[in-house]
């Protein structure tokens, strides 16, 4: 361990074999860490329980700290643990002979954890040897690779072998850092904290939603959060972790921008370019996974494969003739390349991201846990340019945190940058490096339905798209911004579902950023103006012609505005003047057709104020149901009638002018446009007389319109009243018929039950030897009638039994029908008067149905 390790003489196959061994070592350590994580969690829970119980002095003295059982004399005595100094019972501790002390079960598990994790070994060895194990092997392999590339002598000036590398550097490069990951600001701890914070946030959202018990939307939101709690927690935790990592990267890139780039020799860059072009991007061989950083285990591999990094604009190629290299499929903080295929990206990386690796471009300053002791190691650190993945995590306080800046980072605004006709200076500077990697979601279709998703809903893909543009966030902060656009962007970013895609989609088209809002405002104003205009004729008195024109205009504009609004929700960018003209023509055609059908029933005359009130009622009722244009036109027959009346007025006026002109002389002059013949009359006619005739015609037309409206109103009222009366009569009559039928059926069944009872008695007497004959004389008439009918039935049945042959079938049917009718009429008469029958019908029906059922069973 203390000897100098020289791996410069190994071949490629031997180096690959050594790397496989190192990778197996890392895999075994990862499995061991997973196995011990459950034990660590159990010990943490026990420690938190003890911290709470230890505050009660009476409990500590009289009860066991582990099982909480009370101490008793000679049965369950208390013993003090040698490690935690708590009083425990006999069943919760064991005696250590070599220590001559009692140790509780929890302290024994803690000792076992320390022994299995080899923490005691590294605590003793790290004071003697600064670098050992797998870290030492990788260090030497990296040095060998740097020597082969020829860059190490240029960096160090040939002083690489002058110092002993075994006594240099810091303890951060040793294997103990792997086992100390869970104690410091590691990615695993950060992910655990992010998961806990996300879970608390989801719980708080659920509790807030459940607080509104009277709101159905809140209850639905709470149920959705409960059903998708795990998915939302994972997405939110991933977003928090990416935000922390992005913040560190932005800080390092800002410092890289201020510092000069590290020069690379031409020979090294040429060699790497040749190797990069010869290696295929997807051609990972078996040892390709060996160069995966151990810190990458904190996040799933799917996210790592789906988040390609965006290169910083300051990284320019050293040689313009080189082919552009394929970017690594993993982020720079958790991806490493192979030694034989150097893509000028991080080559080697320790489990916590602290030890040296190969990286091109201007290196960010390294953040090691200890300061190196010599210039050799400093040169290696500068060349490696590896920043810790969890350095300075959680250092920001709540007051210093800028939420607008965080939202600007989370929102991928860089999608709109390539569409900007005037690029920023930073974009012009990076234009010669090749196109910047764009997000896959930038090619989405601008469908408005995609912007109105549920809740739905933020997905894991949105949080991953946020990570794609993390390295361009500091460029957008430096670039000048438009205050209005920035305000609109911030409003778009403040989404309830934490979905930054909305803002990017709304501002994706920079050529027409304000057309949609202006169009929407214009249509909204027009719609409100039409609604206000439709209410003014009822408040302000005016002439009949003005009222008709206003109502006609407002009703048509109201229909058009509602149609525009309904179509605008479907496709706001496809509304043109041509479609509006077509829709308006179709409305007028439908209005003409409806008016011809509905104005044919006009016979009476009614006043104009009643017509206006009816128009307002119909227009208000039609606004509530805007399912289709035809249904609105059917309900707004008053507006349609107004359109028809105005058309008829024009026709009558034109016909009158033609008749007047024909009476004075033949109309031989050519037709001229309406605007020219306006105000012109034929020769030889009196203008005053024509005005009087036209005025009288207009008055007659309006009076006829009032008559039509009055008749329509009366017809509608009569139809409603008739419908109500008809429906009410049908229901009551049907109920009476049902009651009568049920009563009759119950009475028939009751009579049949009595008959069957009598028959059973007669049969019993006959079996006993008695000869029963029907009685002829009765004392009372009422009993005589009833018994005569009953005895008639019994007599007929007894006679049928005594006859040698059954009677004819037709006679049997006739006899049974006649007797049934008589029994029914008799029982119906005995129910009482007609006034009491309706009151007792329901109760009697229910009571009589039960014996009917019993009689059916007896048959």
Curated annotation (Swiss-Prot):
Residues 143-560 are annotated as: Myosin-binding. Residues 232-248 are annotated as: Negative regulation of PKA-binding. Its main location: cytoplasm. It is found in: Cytoplasm; Cytoplasm, Perinuclear region; Cytoplasmic vesicle, Secretory vesicle. Keywords: Actin-binding, Cytoplasm, Cytoplasmic vesicle, Metal-binding, Phosphoprotein, Repeat, Zinc, Zinc-finger. InterPro entries: FYVE_2, Intracell_Transport_Effector, Myrip/Melanophilin, Rab_BD, Znf_FYVE_PHD, Znf_RING/FYVE/PHD. GO terms for molecular function: actin binding; myosin binding; protein kinase A binding; small GTPase binding; zinc ion binding. Residues 193-209 are annotated as: PKA-binding. Residues 495-856 are annotated as: Actin-binding. Residues 393-403 have a biased composition (Acidic residues). PROSITE patterns: RABBD (PS50916). One of its GO terms (biological process) is intracellular protein transport. Rab effector protein involved in melanosome transport. Serves as link between melanosome-bound RAB27A and the motor proteins MYO5A and MYO7A. May link RAB27A-containing vesicles to actin filaments. Functions as a protein kinase A-anchoring protein (AKAP). May act as a scaffolding protein that links PKA to components of the exocytosis machinery, thus facilitating exocytosis, including insulin release. Binds MYO5A, MYO7A and F-actin. Binds RAB27A that has been activated by GTP-binding via its N-terminus. Interacts with PRKAR2A. Interacts with components of the exocyst complex, including EXOC3 and EXOC4. This is Rab effector MyRIP. It comes from Homo sapiens.
């Amino acid at each position: 361990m203390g000897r100098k390790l020289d791996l410069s003489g190994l071949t490629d196959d031997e180096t690959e074999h050594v790397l496989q061994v190192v990778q197996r070592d890392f895999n075994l350590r990862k499995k061991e860490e997973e196995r011990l994580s459950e034990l660590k969690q159990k010990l943490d829970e026990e420690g938190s329980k003890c911290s709470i119980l230890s505050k009660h002095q009476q409990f500590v003295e009289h009860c066991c700290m582990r099982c909480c059982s009370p101490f008793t004399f000679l049965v369950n005595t208390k013993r003090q643990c040698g490690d935690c100094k708590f009083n425990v019972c006999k069943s919760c501790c064991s005696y250590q002979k070599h220590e001559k002390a009692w140790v509780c079960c929890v302290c024994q598990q803690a000792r076992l954890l320390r022994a299995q994790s080899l923490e005691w070994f590294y605590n003793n060895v790290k004071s003697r040897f600064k670098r050992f194990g797998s870290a030492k092997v990788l260090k030497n392999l990296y040095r060998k690779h740097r020597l082969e590339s020829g860059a190490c002598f240029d960096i160090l000036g040939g002083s690489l072998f002058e110092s002993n590398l075994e006594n240099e550097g810091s303890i951060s490069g040793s294997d103990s850092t792997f086992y100390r990951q869970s104690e410091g600001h590691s990615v695993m701890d950060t992910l655990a904290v992010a998961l806990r914070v996300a879970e608390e946030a989801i719980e708080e959202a659920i509790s807030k939603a459940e607080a509104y018990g009277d709101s159905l939307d809140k209850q639905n939101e709470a149920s959705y959060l409960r059903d998708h709690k795990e998915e939302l927690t994972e997405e939110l935790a991933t977003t928090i972790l990416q935000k922390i990592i992005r913040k560190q990267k932005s800080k390092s890139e800002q410092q890289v921008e201020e510092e000069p780039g590290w020069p690379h020799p031409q020979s090294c860059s040429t060699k790497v370019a040749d190797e990069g072009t010869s290696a295929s991007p997807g051609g990972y061989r078996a040892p390709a996974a060996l160069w995966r950083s151990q810190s990458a285990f904190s996040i799933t591999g799917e996210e790592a494969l789906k988040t390609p990094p965006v290169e910083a604009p300051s990284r320019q190629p050293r040689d313009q003739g080189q082919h552009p290299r394929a970017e690594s499929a993993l982020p720079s903080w958790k991806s490493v390349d192979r030694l034989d295929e150097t893509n000028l990206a991080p080559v080697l990386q320790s489990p916590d991201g602290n030890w040296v690796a190969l990286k091109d471009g201007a290196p960010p300053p390294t953040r090691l846990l200890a300061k190196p002791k010599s210039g050799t190691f400093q040169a290696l650190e500068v060349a490696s340019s590896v920043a810790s993945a969890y350095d300075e995590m959680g250092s920001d306080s709540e007051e210093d945190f800028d939420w607008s800046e965080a939202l600007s980072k989370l929102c991928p605004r860089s999608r709109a940058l390539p569409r900007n006709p005037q690029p920023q200076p930073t974009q012009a500077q990076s234009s010669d490096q090749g196109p910047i990697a764009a997000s896959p979601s930038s090619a989405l279709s601008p469908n408005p339905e995609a912007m109105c998703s549920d809740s739905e809903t933020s997905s894991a893909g949105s949080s991953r798209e946020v990570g794609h543009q993390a390295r361009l966030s500091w460029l957008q902060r430096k670039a000048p911004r438009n205050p209005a656009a920035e305000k609109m962007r911030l409003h778009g970013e403040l989404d309830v579902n934490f979905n930054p895609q909305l803002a990017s989609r709304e501002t994706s088209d920079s050529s027409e950023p304000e057309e949609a809002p202006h169009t929407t405002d214009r249509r909204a104003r027009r719609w409100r103006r039409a609604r206000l205009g439709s209410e003014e004729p009822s408040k302000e008195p005016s002439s009949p012609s003005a009222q008709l024109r206003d109502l006609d205009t407002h009703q048509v504009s109201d229909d058009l505005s509602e149609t525009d609004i309904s179509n605008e929700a479907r496709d706001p960018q496809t509304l043109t003047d041509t479609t509006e003209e077509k829709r308006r023509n179709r409305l007028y055609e439908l209005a003409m057709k409806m008016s011809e059908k509905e104005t044919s029933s006009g016979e009476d005359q009614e006043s104009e104020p009643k017509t206006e009130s009816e128009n307002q009622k119909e227009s208000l009722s039609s606004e509530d149901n805007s399912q289709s244009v035809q249904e609105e036109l059917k309900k707004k027959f008053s507006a349609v009638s107004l359109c028809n009346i105005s058309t008829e007025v024009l026709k009558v006026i034109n016909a009158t002018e033609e008749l007047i002109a024909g009476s004075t002389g033949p109309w031989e002059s050519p037709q001229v446009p309406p605007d020219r013949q306006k105000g012109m009359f034929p020769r030889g006619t009196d203008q005053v007389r024509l005005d009087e005739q036209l005025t009288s015609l207009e008055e007659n037309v309006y009076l006829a319109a009032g008559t039509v409206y009055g008749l329509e109103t009366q017809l509608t009222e009569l139809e409603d009243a008739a419908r109500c009366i008809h429906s009410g009569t049908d229901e009551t009559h049907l109920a009476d018929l049902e009651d009568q039928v049920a009563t009759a059926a119950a009475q028939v069944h009751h009579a049949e039950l009595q008959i069957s009872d009598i028959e059973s008695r007669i049969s019993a007497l006959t079996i006993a030897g008695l000869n029963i004959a029907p009685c002829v004389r009765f004392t009372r008439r009422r009993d005589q009638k009833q018994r005569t009918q009953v005895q008639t039935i019994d007599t007929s049945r007894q006679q049928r039994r005594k006859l040698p042959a059954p009677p004819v079938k037709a006679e049997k049917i006739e006899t049974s029908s006649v007797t049934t009718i008589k029994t029914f009429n008799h029982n119906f008469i005995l129910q009482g008067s007609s006034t009491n029958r309706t009151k007792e019908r329901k109760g009697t029906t229910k009571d009589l149905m039960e014996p009917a059922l019993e009689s059916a069973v007896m048959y």
